[in-house]
UniProtKB/Swiss-Prot annotation:
Cell compartment(s), UniProt: Cytoplasm
Co-factor(s): Mg(2+)
Protein name: Nucleoside diphosphate kinase
Enzyme Commission no: 2.7.4.6
Xref: SMART domains: NDK
């Protein structure tokens, strides 16, 4: 088992539903520690840079608009196999395909408004964490 860090974003739809605490509880029950957190309303430029990997995809504009539609809660999670564990907690990208009891099955409305983002690999996790947090903002 490897201790890892991963970036998690609770998206505007889930923030609006007031389920931040319920999602945090799931992280903690799964053995993930929240070692950094901030609430932020992303600017269009911030969202475009964060999701730049998708800039040529047809959904890019809609994704950016959704991510700037309201505040998001951004956190760094740490724990054994944190990346895989967080992705398991999140469930499938499309909430209709997500297993019962996952965050997306319970709180997401659509493939676009799908409640959460989580890093998909160690290199992207490190990059995404650096995008939102300086070393002095992470306590782990």
């Amino acid at each position: 088992m490897t201790k890892q860090r991963t970036l998690s974003i609770i998206k505007p739809d889930a923030v609006e539903k007031n389920v931040i605490g319920e999602i945090y509880s799931r992280f903690e029950k799964a053995g993930l520690r929240i070692i950094a957190a901030k609430m932020k309303h992303l600017s269009k430029a911030e969202a475009e840079r964060f999701y730049a990997v998708h800039k040529d995809r047809p959904f890019f504009s809609a994704l950016v608009e959704f991510m700037i539609s309201g505040p998001v809660m951004i956190q760094v999670l740490e724990g054994e196999n944190a990346i895989a564990k967080n992705r398991e907690l999140m469930g499938a990208t499309n909430p209709k395909e997500a297993k019962a009891g996952t965050i997306r099955a319970d709180f997401a409305d659509s493939i676009d408004a799908n409640a959460v983002h989580g890093s998909d690999a160690e290199d992207t996790a490190a990059q995404e964490i650096r995008y939102f947090f300086s070393d002095t903002e992470i306590f782990g």
